[in-house]
A protein has these predicted regions:
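N-terminal pre-ligand scaffold of iron-sulfur
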Residues: 1-79, 104-105
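C-terminal catalytic domain of Rieske-type non-heme iron oxygenases
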Residues: 51, 67-73, 102-305
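Long, hydrophobic, well-ordered secondary-structure blocks that form the structural core
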Residues: 72-105
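Short Pro/Gly-enriched beta-strand edge/turn motifs at strand-loop
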Residues: 38-51, 83-88, 230-236
Length: 305
């Protein structure tokens, strides 16, 4: 590439381009909160986190505190004006009726979806636009249950995390991926785009024997062939990752242009025996847990971009 002087670097490109300020500009950050995060459906938690009547779970979307409550008539979501703890059980729910109720649905394996939009033009299924078709039977055949939760606050823009869940070039950083999956089938996977900005990544069979010498195929999800791997990447930054015996979800909450909170959950089947659950937890945590390997390599990758 020929050398450029200062004015040439500042000159607007003559081809399509993405301005790097999308990763650092506060005005763009606030605009994204208003025009994106306050408008979309977000799978904010799971019904198994609020299993009993009056159980609640708090969260935030676009700096708006919200609370999801398991009421007798079903799961409901409200703007949360109180200083509730992260989760618990409400002795009194009458104050909720003075709060603004938010649109809420339980869909796709028991995920609790919430939108701040008071007049959404689409329900969750319309919003997903077919992106879940590849794994819906695996999620809906049996009730699911959260067995793992941790979160990270990362010095990076949320869009970089979303990118790392949908492209393949960063996988060369991964030791586990190189030994279990770098084959022709891995790179033959197809990224399929859907309306509303969603993508899913086609499946292939992971060779876990190359990693830990163990055949993990005996334990899977309903209708899912052994050791298969599917990913659903939802706009603007949510990830549903079904890999063999465990399901992982990533829910992003942008905190600043250069800071994002990511909540990671691991799921098994509610009907799991103690032995099956222990095996799923082991499989999940080896790759994706807080002391695993793969997840940290992803996070290091986006923090360095």
């Amino acid at each position: 590439m020929p050398a450029r002087k200062h004015t040439q670097w500042l000159k607007k490109p003559t081809v399509d381009y993405v301005d790097s300020r999308i990763y650092s500009d506060w005005d763009i950050f606030y605009e994204e909160q208003e025009k994106i995060f306050k408008k979309v459906w977000i799978p904010i938690c799971h019904e198994s986190e609020i299993p009993e009547v009056n159980d609640y779970r708090t969260a935030a979307i676009a700096e708006q505190n919200i609370v999801m409550v398991n009421l007798k008539e079903g799961v409901r979501a409200y703007e949360n004006p109180n200083n509730l703890g992260v989760a618990g059980n409400l002795d009194d729910t009458t104050w909720l009726y003075d709060c603004t109720e938010l649109h809420c649905e339980v869909k796709y394996g028991g995920l609790v979806w919430v939108t701040l939009d008071p007049n959404p033009t689409m329900d969750v299924e319309q919003w997903a636009a077919g992106a879940f078709d590849c794994i819906q039977s695996a999620l809906d055949t049996e009730p699911l249950e959260v067995f793992h939760y941790h979160k990270g606050i990362i010095g990076s823009n949320y869009k970089l995390w979303h990118d790392t869940n949908s492209e393949f070039y960063h996988d060369f950083m991964h030791y586990f991926n190189r030994v279990t999956g770098f084959n022709e089938e891995y790179f033959a996977r197809k990224n399929t785009g859907f309306p509303n900005g969603h993508v899913n990544v086609g499946s292939f069979e992971v060779n876990y024997e190359a990693f830990d010498g163990a055949d993990r195929g005996a334990l899977s999800f309903p209708t899912l062939p052994p050791n298969q791997w599917y990913m659903v990447d939802l706009f603007p930054g949510m990830n549903i990752n079904l890999r063999g015996s465990a399901l992982r979800t990533d829910i992003v909450t942008p905190l600043a242009p250069d800071k994002v909170m990511i909540e990671f959950r691991g799921f098994g089947l509610k009907k799991d025996t103690p032995e099956e659950r222990a095996e799923r937890i082991k499989h999940h945590n080896t790759i994706w847990g807080p002391f695993g390997r793969n997840l940290h390599e992803d996070l290091i990758g986006i923090a360095g971009q």
